């Protein structure tokens, strides 16, 4: 599976993953809205929005 792994508004980059899902985490801090993308579907702390999906590059 191919997942996007760029941070926030960086140019799109991808990585090949062993997992069958991709994630996109979104949260806000003193720098504004932050976005993290990667492989799998991790547990997140309260206040962090998590979207998990199961197709190539679905987390852009």
Curated annotation (Swiss-Prot):
Classification via SUPFAM superfamilies: Snake toxin-like
PROSITE patterns named among the record's database cross-references: SNAKE_TOXIN
Tissue-specific expression: Expressed by the venom gland.
InterPro entries: Snake_3FTx, Snake_toxin-like_sf, Snake_toxin_con_site, Toxin_cobra-type
GO cellular component, one term: extracellular region
Principal location: secreted
MF-aspect GO terms: acetylcholine receptor inhibitor activity; ion channel regulator activity; toxin activity
Compartmental location: Secreted
Keyword entries, A-Z: Acetylcholine receptor inhibiting toxin, Disulfide bond, Ion channel impairing toxin, Neurotoxin, Postsynaptic neurotoxin, Secreted, Toxin
Signal peptide extent: none
S-S pairs: 3-22, 17-39, 41-52, 53-58
Keyword Secreted: yes
Gene3D superfamilies for the chain: CD59
Main function: Binds to muscle nicotinic acetylcholine receptor (nAChR) and inhibit acetylcholine from binding to the receptor, thereby impairing neuromuscular transmission.
Family: Belongs to the three-finger toxin family. Short-chain subfamily. Type I alpha-neurotoxin sub-subfamily.
Protein name in the entry: Short neurotoxin 1
Species annotation: Hydrophis cyanocinctus
């Amino acid at each position: 599976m191919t997942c996007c792994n760029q941070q926030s508004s960086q140019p799109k980059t991808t990585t090949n993953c062993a997992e069958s899902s991709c994630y996109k985490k979104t949260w806000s801090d003193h720098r504004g809205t932050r976005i993290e993308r990667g492989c799998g579907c991790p547990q997140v702390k309260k206040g962090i929005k998590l979207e998990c999906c199961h197709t190539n590059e679905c987390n852009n």
